[in-house]
Amino acid sequence: MKIVHTADWHLGKILNGKQLLEDQKYILTQFKQHMEKEQPDLIVIAGDLYDTSYPSKEAIGLLEETIEYLNIELKIPIIMISGNHDGRERLNYGSKWFENNQLYIRTQLENIDDPIELSGVQFFTLPFATVSEVQNYFKDKQIETYQQALNECLEQMSSSIDNNKVNILIGHLTIEGGKTSDSERPLTIGTVESVDMHSFRLFDYVMLGHLHHPFSINNSFIKYSGSILQYSFSEVNQSKGYRVLDIENNQLLNETFVPLKPLRELEVIEGDYEDIIQERIKVKNKNNYFHFKLTNVSHITDPMMKLKQIYPNILALSNVVFDHSENFSHVEIKKQDDQTIIENFYKNMTDQHLSQVQSDKIKHLLSFILDREG
């Protein structure tokens, strides 16, 4: 049995005001082409199909088009669960009759001890749920942490584990010690959200969503697929793609990560404004999404507009005005007069020298203060 594991599509994502639907459509078209060649026996989508619980009609249309092609045209069974970004009710709509085409949508805790069995493999689903939702489901107010909530869910699943079969868990959560990214919305406020990886010993393999780095943790049987695109500048240079797991005769044979190539990558470029404008600093692709961190910007009128003429998809510009290499030690500062200290501070903060008029005014003020104190 060949299983493809993906997650965190975040359809409808907006990054720094830029709608990413074009990029998402491009990457999902590529994903569909890969599935034509892979011909998997199952696709698992481990949550966060949408970026918001109220997705746009364009985002809904893209998901429907993609799932219809994979499930109806290619006839690939699909199991998907809801993540913390998804609107559970919207995603769950029509789920009962979709199962006639082997499209299994699991968004409710009521199904956690009812595994989906395909080709002799049991797939347990654990959609995202808050601690309070788990409290209410089990009618147990003693559940106060994510670890306790997970333990209750796993305890209920344990009665359905068949040790004569391969048992796989599909979940949307944070493993303790996993690498995080800026684009991941916290699962909770005020509660530790990570769980111990040793909690999953019941299972032969665990397929997760939520963390966007495909190598968030180093574990042979617990894997994140990662997101399909770079969704924050903290994910620069991260490979994005999907995982493939092969099972034969109740044995996990091998697992591989398959990268996808995006329409545009995210780049963070540091340097001097003039070097960027004159294209003296090399970038991977001028059409990528950029965050420029530049010096000598403060005196430029509308630098963003000027940069966009060369780099049309710039999303962020930071004015780097303080160079730590020019810091002065306490000893050096004590050796300087007040006028020099002020002039150096102004230069460090603005990348400009005081004008003669400004310098004269400061000299006058310092003289006035010293005279008053004397």
From Swiss-Prot:
GO biological process, any: DNA replication
CDD domains in the cross-refs: MPP_Mre11_N
Gene Ontology MF terms: 3'-5' exonuclease activity; endonuclease activity
UniProt KW keywords: DNA recombination, DNA replication, Endonuclease, Exonuclease, Hydrolase, Nuclease
Gene3D superfamilies reported for this sequence: 3.60.21.10
Family: Belongs to the SbcD family.
Function: SbcCD cleaves DNA hairpin structures. These structures can inhibit DNA replication and are intermediates in certain DNA recombination reactions. The complex acts as a 3'->5' double strand exonuclease that can open hairpins. It also has a 5' single-strand endonuclease activity.
Subunit structure: Heterodimer of SbcC and SbcD.
Name this polypeptide is given: Nuclease SbcCD subunit D
Organism of derivation: Staphylococcus epidermidis (strain ATCC 35984 / DSM 28319 / BCRC 17069 / CCUG 31568 / BM 3577 / RP62A)
